[in-house]
């Protein structure tokens, strides 16, 4: 089943920031998103489930400092953030 990709406004702003600032990181984000679309909560970037306020969301490592935060639902994958660490 194919899921559609949905971007929260903050995540969209993060993505646009990376387009202007660092193409290498942008390429990594794109790789992680493609892997989420293919493999769900398994694969590259050390996927881990988040807890507390972010229960239901997962994160993957973009760099040592930055994480891709997302949630997989029946019909969509929601990207919540792709800059900084979760909760920042």
Q: PLM features: residue spans?
A:
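Enriched for short, Lys/Arg-rich terminal
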Residues: 2-4, 10-27, 31, 44, ...
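A short, surface-exposed loop/turn module that caps and links secondary-structure elements
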Residues: 34-61
